[in-house]
């Protein structure tokens, strides 16, 4: 039994989930996925801002309007993807991918760039339409990597969707292999002028969900691991976009290994999140949080059960002086674990397990 089979056996052992556990996991995934997928691409909303925006529709603190709109649209796209994944008798289409992209970008917009000599140029990013100009990326090693040309993109996307539908029917690949191969091939095409990374991560989860596998989050704090896995695979596959867009399972082995390990890690987190219980067990952005001081958990539990509790009352209940309470509050706030609402109530961003 390989590692994917082992982790799926552990996952299946805790099924069916209670309604409460399904809701808890769905809420955590919604925040984690949207925050991380957009943060990888430069969105500046904090984890706490993302949670409050998506759960309550409110903005806390300073935030760029573009980032707020982007995060809101991302959540709409996530919901759309999950609904489409349940239509298992309907094959994947290019139309769905383009519609998903239009949902993420919302509308066409112009990008302005300064040229040497003080001149300015601009071009239009099209929502839901394949690229009309070449795109490339400067890798972390300083070299330019070209994606498929606008002329070859429609045919390559047609090949990708056709391959996926046939591969799914054949049963030749596991859902994890399908998701990894689709992600890599899609990235090598880079069919749109913007939003390709976000679409790739949504589509990988579309494939997993379509086969009743847990969905995953590429954590922004591990962005370098993600990009390095893609880069190393590019070196193996070769620079030609048309070759990358048809890469075999053997050729993308390095990215498949990364993706498989990510899947195991994320499902392990889900299992722990749902099964570990206790007043000292806390969760934040895909990690189990342990505190050195027992008073920190006591403070968080009091804030959770009594959001309007005052600092003097926290001091009295925990048995430490007010200066120590304020010091811990500052540390928790800095890490993004807690916020204080405008009415003075405490809002926990970190998640309790009780």
Locate predicted features.
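FIC/Doc superfamily catalytic core
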Residues: 1-354
């Amino acid at each position: 039994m390989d590692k994917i089979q082992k982790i799926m056996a552990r996952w299946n052992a805790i099924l069916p989930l209670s309604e409460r556990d399904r809701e808890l996991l769905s809420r955590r995934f919604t925040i984690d996925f949207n925050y991380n997928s957009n943060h990888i691409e430069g969105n500046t909303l904090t984890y706490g801002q993302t949670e409050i925006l998506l759960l309550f529709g409110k903005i806390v603190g300073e935030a760029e309007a573009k980032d707020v709109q982007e995060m809101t649209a991302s959540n709409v796209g996530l919901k759309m993807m999950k609904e489409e994944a349940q239509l298992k008798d309907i094959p994947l289409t290019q139309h769905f991918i383009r519609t998903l992209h239009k949902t993420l970008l919302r509308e066409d917009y112009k990008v302005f760039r300064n040229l040497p000599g003080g001149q300015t140029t601009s071009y239009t990013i099209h929502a839901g339409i394949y690229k009309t100009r070449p795109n490339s990326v400067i890798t972390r090693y300083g070299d330019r990597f070209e994606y498929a040309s606008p002329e070859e993109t429609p045919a390559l996307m047609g090949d990708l969707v056709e391959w996926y539908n046939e591969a799914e029917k054949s049963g030749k690949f596991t859902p994890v292999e399908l998701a990894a191969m689709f992600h890599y091939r899609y990235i090598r095409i880079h069919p749109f002028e913007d939003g390709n990374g976000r679409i790739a991560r949504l589509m990988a989860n579309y494939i997993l969900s379509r086969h009743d596998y847990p969905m995953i989050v590429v954590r922004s704090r591990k962005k370098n691991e993600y990009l390095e896995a893609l880069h190393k695979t590019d070196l193996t596959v070769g620079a030609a976009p048309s070759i990358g867009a048809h890469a075999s399972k053997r050729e993308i082995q390095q990215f498949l290994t990364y993706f498989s390990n990510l899947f195991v890690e994320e499902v392990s987190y889900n299992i722990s999140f749902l099964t570990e219980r206790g007043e000292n067990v806390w969760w934040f952005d895909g990690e189990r949080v342990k505190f050195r001081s027992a008073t920190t958990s006591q403070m968080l539990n009091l804030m959770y059960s009594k959001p309007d509790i005052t600092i003097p009352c926290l001091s009295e209940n925990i048995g430490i002086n007010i200066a120590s309470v304020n010091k811990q509050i500052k540390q928790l706030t800095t890490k993004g674990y807690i916020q204080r609402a405008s009415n003075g109530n405490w809002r926990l961003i970190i998640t309790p397990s009780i």
